Regions:
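Short, ordered beta-strand-loop transition motifs
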Residues: 28-30, 66-75, 125-126
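Gly/Pro-enriched, hydrophobic low-complexity segments
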Residues: 73-187
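Intrinsically disordered, low-complexity boundary segments flanking structured domains
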Residues: 46-53, 64-67, 120-121, 156-159
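Right-handed parallel beta-helix
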Residues: 59-67, 74, 93-95
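N-terminal mature ectodomain segment of secretory-pathway/periplasmic proteins
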Residues: 1-49, 58-66
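A short, hydrophobic/aromatic-rich structural module that often spans a beta strand
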Residues: 54-62, 128-131, 188-189
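A short, amphipathic edge element
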Residues: 54-65, 113-117, 169
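Extracellular/periplasmic catalytic domains that process cell-envelope and extracellular macromolecules
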Residues: 54-55, 69-72, 87
């Protein structure tokens, strides 16, 4: 696949946040060009929407490789560690379909105990197996009730308003593959 255009329908169910559904058109061209277009506001994690293994391996080192059985057949499990000390993600597990080398799941452990799981589904589009659904779930360990008890000698600190859990679902549709996208689409505006 040299280039493609795809429509993304994004829904989010995130604790403590009201996020309206989003409709975004994504343009992609080899080797690593992306552009997003939407009529309204859209906030998308580029690395999650269009998974790029070479970019991932530039930021993480492979620590372990294993093989497992899954519902779809065989998978390779790669355990990755962050190359930099200041990385937000300390550890990644990437599960890759052994037949076509596409990621099926990515499990991420963050420095503060939170975790993120991304699950990919694929369908044939013009003879190519392309993403059809991405589900991202994030969670945090339960709050320690002992931490919430006020200490009479300390100034009270505001509790974090960060979401503790949620799900983001991205549906891919309307693919146009190898249409010869112009580089002009990717110029920053």
């Amino acid at each position: 696949v040299q280039d493609y255009t795809v429509d993304l329908d994004v829904t989010a169910d995130i604790e403590r946040m009201n996020v309206p559904p989003m409709h975004v058109r994504m343009y992609y061209k080899q080797p690593d060009k992306f552009q997003f277009a939407s009529e309204g506001f859209a906030l998308l994690p580029r690395d999650g929407v269009a998974f790029n293994a070479s970019k991932l391996l530039s930021r993480f080192s492979v620590e372990e490789v294993g093989e497992e059985s899954s519902q779809g057949g065989r998978e390779f499990r790669l355990l990755l560690r962050a190359r930099g000390e200041r990385a937000k993600t300390t550890k990644l597990q990437v599960f890759v379909d052994a037949d076509d080398w596409k990621p099926t799941r990515v499990l991420s452990s963050l420095f503060d105990g939170r975790s993120v799981t991304a699950a990919f589904k694929y369908e044939k589009q013009n003879g190519h197996r392309m993403p059809s659904l991405l589900t991202v779930e994030f969670s945090a360990p339960p709050a320690d009730t002992m931490d919430q008890m006020p200490d009479p000698d300390e100034v009270p600190m505001p509790r974090s308003h960060m979401p503790r859990k949620g799900t983001i679902t991205i549906k891919y549709s309307g693919y146009k593959i190898n249409s010869g996208l112009s580089d002009d689409i990717f110029d920053k505006k």
